Amino acid sequence: TKHVLTAPPRWDNQEWRNMGLAALGVVGVMAVIDRPVQDAMRRIAPDSDPLTPDDNRFLHEMERFGREYSLGLLGGFYVAGALNHDERAVAMAQDGLTSIIIASGIITTATKVAVGRARPRDDVGIAHFRPFGGDQSFPSGHTSHAFAVASVIANHYDETWVTCTSYSVASLVGVARSYHGGHFASDILAGAMIGTLVGKSVVEYNKS
């Protein structure tokens, strides 16, 4: 955890450039895409409730991969790995849990509180920010959680179908959050970046 959280001072120029481009990408999405995506989702699911199954049961279930389903998946890998003496499966489960704690539990939570962005369902616009005021839309915690797990799986199991499946499921978590009015597109993009970076960093550090 300490290694990942203290990584920025060790970044080289290329890594800082990449981070700058990522930040610009999030700002660009916020300015250009957030409103059209929100309007489209409202037309598709105007009365959608994120807490109960609705007309789109599929997205309701996919959203849970940003919380309990992915934890169950990691638990399954750990148990199966321990029973079958599969060190990679055990390491993947451990790295996945560590990445969730760092990406979703620490970085995302702290950023949410500091930024204080209102959610789409609050209907106050895309640029309503109250730092430390209670609003917590940016970034998406479900998405950072899901992408942290996807990144860990993809970095442990280097098969194309595994990578595609992992990131596809994580992406659908983001779609579900937008569908349910929980997040703007830029919230989801930022969460995906955080989760992916943290997952990759945790795996690389523990393999080194």
Question: How would you name each of these model-derived features?
Answer:
Residues 1-66, 70-84, 113-114, 120-136, ...:
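N-terminal targeting leaders of membrane proteins
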